[in-house]
Structures are given as C-alpha cells and as structure tokens.
Amino acid sequence: MSVISMKQLLEAGVHFGHQTRRWNPKMKRYIFTERNGIYIIDLQKTVKKVEEAYNFTKNLAAEGGKILFVGTKKQAQDSVKEEAQRSGMYYVNQRWLGGTLTNFETIQKRIKRLKDIEKMQENGTFDVLPKKEVVQLKKELERLEKFLGGIKDMKDLPDALFIIDPRKERIAVAEARKLNIPIIGIVDTNCDPDEIDVVIPANDDAIRAVKLLTSKMADAILEAKQGEEEAEVAEETAPETETTTA
C-alpha cells in the first residue's frame, strides 16, 4: 500500500507549481502540464518520491539517525515545529542562522547561554537580580529561544535535513552540502533539484501541502521508533532457550 494517495495530494493542492515564467528547467521531468500560466506537477512522480523519502527517513531513524526539519517561510513554520516535536526531532522555523552547521561550536555556545538563562529563571536567580537586568535577560532568552529553541538539544550535527523550499533555505542547503549531510526536500518548479538528495516534487507554498508532506516524514520516523520499541519488547519477553546436555 502506498505511503500517500493521489487523492490526498490533490486535495492538499500539492500539484500546483509556480508560474511558468518562474521555473527551473531542471524541474521539467517532474512537470505534467501547464494550465493558465501555472505548471502542474506530475503527481504520479510525487507519489513515488514521497515513498522514496519515507523509506529513506524511516531507515535513517531506525539506525538512530537524527533529522533536522527546516522551514522558515510562513507557510511552513507551524508544520515544521509541530511535526518535528511530534517525532522527537529538531527544527529551525525562524531565520536560519549562518553557521548553524558549519560553525556548530559557536552555535553550541549560544545554546549554552540559552540554557544558562533558563536555569537562572528556574532556580530563583531572577528574584534577587535588579529588575532592569531581569528585563534584559528575559529579552535575551526570548530571542535565543526563538532562533535556537528547536535545536537546543541537538548535541551533534544532524544525520539529514528535511527542507521545505531549498531556494528559500539556500544557506542551509549550502552548509549541508559542504558537510555531506543528505537533504530530503520539498522542491517546487522554481527550485534546483540537483542540490537535493531525495527530491519530493510538490507545491511548497500551500499550508495544507506542506503540512501533509511534513507529517508523512514525521510518520516515517515514528514508524521506525515503534519498530525499535516492538523489537525491544519482543527481546525482553522472548523465552530463554534452555541448553540441554546429553
């Protein structure tokens, strides 16, 4: 059975690409036709590519791999946060800070600062500090949480990135490629598919389309985790084999 149906894709508007004047010729193989000045994506190919992305994600998660969800455009922000949290993964849904991957040590220092201020808030330090200082610390905490909250528990570089709109997230794409980190991407008709390891040709502007595809990647991770748990339970409950000596 397919991971996703043609009906689901149609209902979410996954097939609507960009205007024909705003396209990347490299996406030609994923385009079905043109209608009223808009390219229509070939959903038969999208179904296959979603399946490929699902299996890639599931296999990676089954091996303990960590995936960073990236989508900073308005249409993606909520889905990226919700689905990454649902599947226990990391996310960036505000501005991508240059060096998030390539200057990971510096980012870790900022995350440490975030956690230090959180501790101060929790252990009562705020109560004994001057009001003015507390206001400044709260502002700093809010800013750090906004940009780093989704990766504050990411102790190492991710094993893959799931990106919505690689054109918008070109800095993230460049950093991942520099470090040979594989990229799964929702790629619209105006993007360059050659930069992405696992391409999902789809509308990256419709909230419903983004939500549907992002939730499928989260489902793949959860399926892998469920498989691990079931294997552990089976191992624990398996009867011990007795060895008999002749």
UniProtKB/Swiss-Prot annotation:
Keyword match Transmembrane: no
SUPFAM superfamilies documented for this protein: Ribosomal protein S2 (SSF52313)
Assigned keywords, A-Z: Ribonucleoprotein, Ribosomal protein
Gene Ontology molecular-function annotations: structural constituent of ribosome
Record GO biological process: translation
Cellular component terms per the entry's GO annotation: cytosolic small ribosomal subunit
Superkingdom to which the source organism belongs: Bacteria
Extent of the signal sequence: none
Region (Disordered): 226-246
Listed CDD domains: RPS2
Ranges of compositional bias, category Acidic residues: 229-239
InterPro entries in alphabetical order: Ribosomal_uS2, Ribosomal_uS2_bac/mit/plastid, Ribosomal_uS2_CS, Ribosomal_uS2_flav_dom_sf
S-adenosyl-L-methionine listed as a keyword: no
Subunit structure as annotated in this protein's UniProt entry: Part of the 30S ribosomal subunit. Interacts with BrxC.
Family: Belongs to the universal ribosomal protein uS2 family.
Name recorded for this polypeptide: Small ribosomal subunit protein uS2
Organism, scientific name: Bacillus subtilis (strain 168)
Origin organism lineage: Bacteria, Bacillati, Bacillota, Bacilli, Bacillales
Gene name tied to this protein: rpsB
